[in-house]
Protein backbone atom coordinates (compact mmCIF):
# COMPACT_ATOMS: atom_id res chain seq x y z
CA UNK A 1 0.00 0.00 0.00
CA UNK A 2 2.07 2.96 1.26
CA UNK A 3 5.86 2.54 1.35
CA UNK A 4 8.16 5.24 2.71
CA UNK A 5 11.85 4.41 2.47
CA UNK A 6 14.84 6.31 3.87
CA UNK A 7 13.19 9.72 3.64
CA UNK A 8 15.18 12.68 4.97
CA UNK A 9 14.04 16.30 4.86
CA UNK A 10 15.06 19.66 6.28
CA UNK A 11 14.04 23.31 6.28
CA UNK A 12 17.25 25.21 5.60
CA UNK A 13 18.74 26.63 8.79
CA UNK A 14 16.49 24.48 10.96
CA UNK A 15 18.44 21.46 9.85
CA UNK A 16 17.04 18.01 9.25
CA UNK A 17 13.48 17.41 10.44
CA UNK A 18 13.34 13.82 9.16
CA UNK A 19 16.30 11.45 9.22
CA UNK A 20 16.14 8.29 7.10
CA UNK A 21 12.49 7.65 7.96
CA UNK A 22 10.89 4.44 6.71
CA UNK A 23 7.30 3.29 7.17
CA UNK A 24 5.03 0.70 5.60
CA UNK A 25 1.23 0.88 5.83
CA UNK A 26 -0.15 -2.48 4.64
CA UNK A 27 -3.50 -2.99 2.96
CA UNK A 28 -6.46 -3.33 5.33
CA UNK A 29 -4.45 -2.09 8.30
CA UNK A 30 -4.63 1.00 10.51
CA UNK A 31 -1.30 2.44 11.63
CA UNK A 32 -1.08 5.06 14.36
CA UNK A 33 1.75 7.59 14.34
CA UNK A 34 2.56 9.45 17.55
CA UNK A 35 5.27 11.87 18.60
CA UNK A 36 5.82 15.23 20.28
CA UNK A 37 5.04 18.50 18.54
CA UNK A 38 7.75 19.40 16.06
CA UNK A 39 8.92 15.83 15.58
CA UNK A 40 8.16 15.87 11.85
CA UNK A 41 4.78 14.13 11.65
CA UNK A 42 3.06 16.79 9.55
CA UNK A 43 6.18 17.22 7.42
CA UNK A 44 6.10 13.51 6.62
CA UNK A 45 2.41 13.64 5.73
CA UNK A 46 3.01 16.66 3.48
CA UNK A 47 5.75 14.74 1.69
CA UNK A 48 3.45 11.75 1.17
CA UNK A 49 0.76 14.05 -0.26
CA UNK A 50 3.32 15.85 -2.47
CA UNK A 51 2.73 19.19 -0.75
CA UNK A 52 6.49 19.30 -0.10
CA UNK A 53 9.07 18.21 -2.66
CA UNK A 54 10.81 14.97 -1.77
CA UNK A 55 14.59 15.41 -1.85
CA UNK A 56 15.95 12.18 -0.42
CA UNK A 57 14.44 8.71 -0.21
CA UNK A 58 11.37 7.30 -1.94
CA UNK A 59 7.61 7.19 -1.40
CA UNK A 60 5.29 4.87 -3.30
CA UNK A 61 1.56 4.34 -3.07
CA UNK A 62 -0.05 1.26 -4.62
CA UNK A 63 3.30 0.57 -6.27
CA UNK A 64 3.32 3.98 -8.00
CA UNK A 65 5.52 6.98 -7.31
CA UNK A 66 3.73 9.28 -4.87
CA UNK A 67 3.77 12.17 -7.36
CA UNK A 68 1.77 10.23 -9.95
CA UNK A 69 -1.92 10.86 -10.54
CA UNK A 70 -2.69 7.22 -9.72
CA UNK A 71 -1.03 7.52 -6.33
CA UNK A 72 -2.64 10.86 -5.49
CA UNK A 73 -6.16 9.66 -6.23
CA UNK A 74 -5.52 6.73 -3.88
CA UNK A 75 -4.91 8.99 -0.86
CA UNK A 76 -7.44 11.01 1.12
CA UNK A 77 -5.86 13.46 3.57
CA UNK A 78 -8.09 14.79 6.33
CA UNK A 79 -6.17 17.54 8.12
CA UNK A 80 -6.35 19.02 11.57
CA UNK A 81 -7.85 22.38 10.60
CA UNK A 82 -11.39 23.08 9.45
CA UNK A 83 -10.50 24.80 6.18
CA UNK A 84 -13.39 23.93 3.90
CA UNK A 85 -14.80 26.38 1.33
CA UNK A 86 -17.50 28.39 3.08
CA UNK A 87 -19.08 29.46 -0.22
CA UNK A 88 -20.26 25.89 -0.92
CA UNK A 89 -22.97 23.80 0.65
CA UNK A 90 -21.99 20.55 2.30
CA UNK A 91 -23.36 18.61 -0.66
CA UNK A 92 -21.47 20.77 -3.15
CA UNK A 93 -18.25 20.26 -1.23
CA UNK A 94 -18.60 16.47 -1.05
CA UNK A 95 -19.67 16.11 -4.68
CA UNK A 96 -16.87 18.38 -5.93
CA UNK A 97 -14.26 16.45 -3.95
CA UNK A 98 -15.69 13.18 -5.25
CA UNK A 99 -15.31 14.37 -8.86
CA UNK A 100 -11.66 15.22 -8.18
CA UNK A 101 -11.19 11.59 -7.14
CA UNK A 102 -12.99 10.34 -10.23
CA UNK A 103 -16.15 9.12 -8.50
CA UNK A 104 -19.75 10.30 -8.43
CA UNK A 105 -21.29 11.22 -5.09
CA UNK A 106 -24.77 9.92 -4.32
CA UNK A 107 -26.99 12.61 -2.80
CA UNK A 108 -29.02 10.20 -0.69
CA UNK A 109 -25.88 8.49 0.63
CA UNK A 110 -24.40 11.85 1.54
CA UNK A 111 -27.61 12.79 3.32
CA UNK A 112 -27.56 9.55 5.32
CA UNK A 113 -23.93 10.08 6.35
CA UNK A 114 -24.62 13.65 7.46
CA UNK A 115 -27.67 12.47 9.41
CA UNK A 116 -25.60 9.74 11.07
CA UNK A 117 -23.33 12.46 12.43
CA UNK A 118 -26.26 14.51 13.75
CA UNK A 119 -26.44 16.89 10.78
CA UNK A 120 -29.80 15.99 9.24
CA UNK A 121 -30.47 18.27 6.25
CA UNK A 122 -27.35 20.33 6.93
CA UNK A 123 -25.74 19.20 3.67
CA UNK A 124 -27.94 21.68 1.79
CA UNK A 125 -26.80 24.67 3.85
CA UNK A 126 -23.76 26.83 3.17
CA UNK A 127 -20.66 25.69 5.03
CA UNK A 128 -20.28 29.32 6.12
CA UNK A 129 -23.09 28.63 8.62
CA UNK A 130 -21.40 25.51 10.06
CA UNK A 131 -19.77 25.43 13.47
CA UNK A 132 -16.18 24.26 13.89
CA UNK A 133 -17.36 20.79 14.88
CA UNK A 134 -19.73 20.56 11.92
CA UNK A 135 -16.92 21.44 9.52
CA UNK A 136 -14.76 18.73 11.04
CA UNK A 137 -17.61 16.23 10.67
CA UNK A 138 -18.04 17.27 7.04
CA UNK A 139 -14.37 16.53 6.36
CA UNK A 140 -14.70 13.14 8.01
CA UNK A 141 -17.91 12.35 6.12
CA UNK A 142 -15.97 12.88 2.89
CA UNK A 143 -13.41 10.30 3.96
CA UNK A 144 -16.11 7.79 4.87
CA UNK A 145 -17.96 8.34 1.60
CA UNK A 146 -15.05 8.29 -0.88
CA UNK A 147 -13.53 4.96 0.23
CA UNK A 148 -9.97 5.81 -0.87
CA UNK A 149 -7.41 3.00 -0.55
CA UNK A 150 -5.51 5.08 2.03
CA UNK A 151 -6.94 7.72 4.35
CA UNK A 152 -4.56 9.88 6.37
CA UNK A 153 -6.14 11.42 9.47
CA UNK A 154 -4.05 14.18 11.08
CA UNK A 155 -5.58 15.28 14.40
CA UNK A 156 -8.92 15.64 12.64
CA UNK A 157 -11.05 14.49 15.57
CA UNK A 158 -10.08 17.47 17.73
CA UNK A 159 -13.20 19.54 18.32
CA UNK A 160 -15.87 16.94 17.57
CA UNK A 161 -18.37 15.79 20.19
CA UNK A 162 -18.20 12.45 21.98
CA UNK A 163 -21.02 10.88 19.95
CA UNK A 164 -19.17 11.69 16.73
CA UNK A 165 -15.94 10.34 18.26
CA UNK A 166 -17.52 6.92 18.80
CA UNK A 167 -19.03 7.00 15.31
CA UNK A 168 -15.58 7.69 13.87
CA UNK A 169 -14.14 4.70 15.71
CA UNK A 170 -16.86 2.55 14.18
CA UNK A 171 -16.34 3.99 10.69
CA UNK A 172 -12.55 3.55 10.87
CA UNK A 173 -12.99 -0.13 11.67
CA UNK A 174 -15.52 -0.50 8.85
CA UNK A 175 -13.05 1.01 6.42
CA UNK A 176 -10.44 -1.53 7.47
CA UNK A 177 -13.03 -4.27 7.05
CA UNK A 178 -13.51 -3.14 3.43
CA UNK A 179 -9.80 -3.66 2.78
CA UNK A 180 -8.91 0.03 3.08
CA UNK A 181 -5.91 1.37 4.99
CA UNK A 182 -5.44 4.31 7.35
CA UNK A 183 -2.59 6.30 8.84
CA UNK A 184 -3.79 8.12 11.96
CA UNK A 185 -1.60 10.85 13.41
CA UNK A 186 -2.99 11.71 16.83
CA UNK A 187 -2.28 12.46 20.48
CA UNK A 188 -5.59 10.76 21.32
CA UNK A 189 -4.27 7.49 22.72
CA UNK A 190 -7.77 6.18 23.48
CA UNK A 191 -8.64 6.50 19.79
CA UNK A 192 -5.44 4.74 18.74
CA UNK A 193 -5.95 1.91 21.23
CA UNK A 194 -9.45 1.26 19.87
CA UNK A 195 -8.66 1.42 16.17
CA UNK A 196 -5.03 0.78 15.24
CA UNK A 197 -3.18 -2.42 14.41
CA UNK A 198 0.29 -0.92 14.82
CA UNK A 199 1.92 2.09 16.45
CA UNK A 200 5.03 3.96 15.34
CA UNK A 201 6.81 6.72 17.25
CA UNK A 202 8.42 9.65 15.46
CA UNK A 203 10.86 11.50 17.71
CA UNK A 204 13.70 13.84 16.82
CA UNK A 205 13.15 13.05 13.16
CA UNK A 206 13.58 9.29 13.55
CA UNK A 207 10.90 6.63 13.20
CA UNK A 208 10.67 3.65 15.53
CA UNK A 209 9.97 0.16 14.27
CA UNK A 210 6.21 -0.57 14.28
CA UNK A 211 4.80 -2.44 17.26
CA UNK A 212 1.42 -4.20 17.44
CA UNK A 213 -0.99 -2.05 19.41
CA UNK A 214 -2.22 -5.09 21.31
CA UNK A 215 1.29 -5.93 22.53
CA UNK A 216 1.73 -2.35 23.78
CA UNK A 217 -1.55 -2.53 25.69
CA UNK A 218 -0.75 -5.96 27.12
CA UNK A 219 2.80 -5.05 28.07
CA UNK A 220 2.35 -1.50 29.35
CA UNK A 221 -1.36 -1.12 30.07
CA UNK A 222 -1.73 1.43 27.30
CA UNK A 223 0.03 3.66 24.82
CA UNK A 224 0.54 6.48 27.34
CA UNK A 225 2.73 4.37 29.63
CA UNK A 226 4.65 2.90 26.69
CA UNK A 227 5.29 6.40 25.40
CA UNK A 228 6.47 7.55 28.84
CA UNK A 229 8.90 4.63 29.10
CA UNK A 230 10.23 5.20 25.60
CA UNK A 231 10.74 8.89 26.42
CA UNK A 232 12.70 8.07 29.58
CA UNK A 233 14.83 5.56 27.67
CA UNK A 234 15.69 8.22 25.10
CA UNK A 235 16.92 10.72 27.69
CA UNK A 236 20.72 11.00 28.07
Give the ranges of each region predicted by the language model.
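Conserved ABC ATPase "signature" region
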Residues: 95, 107-122
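H-loop/switch region of ABC-family ATPase nucleotide-binding domains
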Residues: 186-187
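A short, flexible loop at the N-terminus of ABC-type nucleotide-binding domains that lies
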Residues: 1-4, 8-20
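Helix-to-loop junction immediately C-terminal to a conserved catalytic motif
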Residues: 49
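The feature captures the beta-strand-to-loop junction immediately N-terminal to the Walker
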Residues: 34-36
Amino acid sequence: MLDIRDVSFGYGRRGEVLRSVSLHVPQARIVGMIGPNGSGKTTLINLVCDVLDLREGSITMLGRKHTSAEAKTGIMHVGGNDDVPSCLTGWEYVSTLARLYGVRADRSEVGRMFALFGMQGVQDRLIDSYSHGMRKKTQLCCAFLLHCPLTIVDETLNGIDIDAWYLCVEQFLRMRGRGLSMLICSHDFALLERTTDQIVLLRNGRMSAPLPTRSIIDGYGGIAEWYRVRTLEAEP
